């Protein structure tokens, strides 16, 4: 009887061992299959604001298809969700922001996104609202500017260049300035900080507005043609728009394919002919 029980137990142990072994092989095969599938993934998903970023991406679709990739462009209308989606793994890259904004986003959110490569810059402009020119601006007039750190600095520097305000010494394009850094405001201007995407709509309610290049383009405004004054080109180049990815993925096959397609003569020609100075390539 003891021998019979021992034999049964030994058989059970043997069966368990075989089952465990079989499970390990199955799991290993599944993992290998998953890795292979990931390696075969030829869809590049990029988040972008509609104008000009999504339009520029779409101009590169054919070049990517020639390399065996499908480009999936996901459009966003604000400056936060494209980075959040990239951090969460919903995107392979995004294309909407300049380096100072990206650095500030990482700092404020504890994220680790990286600029994969440079693309273009969009000059900021001051646009007429209820007041038609800088010369006609009256005491106490209202001016709308973007409320996010790096772009607010950019707007304030432009107002300073226009002779409307004076900022503290040391404020430059890399600073994180607000209207509290204004030291002189001779016309007692009412400077209103609002979300960048709302700036074009604010023109009906304010005397002037300093508008980001992409949102100006969406409102059929061209900084080179329609603004009262555009920012210093040296400042503008500090704010080069980049394609961003998760840190460590800058040299991945997808990002390098995207770089090759976007930094092409065909895309440069498309940008020059389409935006006529409102978007300036840097490659």
Positions of PLM-derived features:
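Sec-dependent N-terminal signal peptides of Gram-positive bacterial secreted proteins and lipoproteins
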Residues: 2-24
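A bilobed periplasmic-binding-protein/Venus flytrap-type ligand-binding module shared by bacterial periplasmic
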Residues: 123-134, 239-252
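Ligand-binding "clamshell"
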Residues: 104-116, 130-131, 205, 210, ...
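Short, well-ordered beta-strand elements
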Residues: 39-51, 69-75, 142-143
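Bacterial lipoprotein signal-peptidase II cleavage site
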Residues: 17-40
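Periplasmic-binding protein-like
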Residues: 153-160, 262-283
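A conserved helix-loop-strand patch within extracytoplasmic ligand-binding domains
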Residues: 116-165, 268
């Amino acid at each position: 009887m003891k021998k019979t029980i021992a034999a049964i137990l030994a058989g059970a142990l043997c069966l368990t061992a075989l089952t465990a072994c079989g499970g390990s092989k199955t799991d290993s095969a599944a993992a290998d299959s998953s890795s292979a599938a990931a390696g075969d993934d030829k869809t590049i998903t990029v988040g972008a604001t509609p104008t000009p970023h999504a339009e520029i991406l779409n101009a590169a679709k054919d070049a990517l298809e020639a390399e065996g990739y499908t480009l999936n462009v996901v459009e966003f209308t604000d400056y936060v969700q494209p980075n959040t989606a990239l951090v969460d793994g919903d995107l392979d890259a995004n294309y909407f922001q300049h380096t100072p904004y990206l650095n500030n986003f990482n700092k404020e959110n504890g994220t680790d996104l990286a600029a994969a490569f440079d693309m273009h810059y969009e000059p900021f402009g001051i646009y007429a609202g209820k007041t038609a020119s800088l010369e006609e601006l009256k005491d106490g007039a209202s001016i709308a500017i973007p409320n996010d750190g790096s772009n607010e600095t950019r707007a304030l520097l432009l107002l300073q260049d226009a002779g409307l305000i004076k900022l503290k010494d040391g404020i430059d394009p890399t600073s994180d300035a607000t209207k509290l850094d204004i030291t002189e405001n001779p016309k007692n201007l009412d400077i209103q900080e609002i979300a960048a995407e709302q700036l074009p709509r604010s023109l009906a309610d304010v005397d002037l507005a300093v508008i980001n290049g992409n949102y100006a383009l969406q409102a059929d405004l061209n900084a080179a043609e329609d603004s009262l004054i555009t920012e210093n080109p040296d400042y503008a180049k500090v704010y080069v728009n980049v394609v961003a990815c998760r840190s460590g993925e800058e040299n991945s096959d997808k990002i390098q394919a995207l770089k090759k397609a976007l930094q092409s003569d065909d895309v440069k020609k498309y940008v020059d002919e389409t935006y006529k100075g409102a978007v300036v390539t840097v490659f």
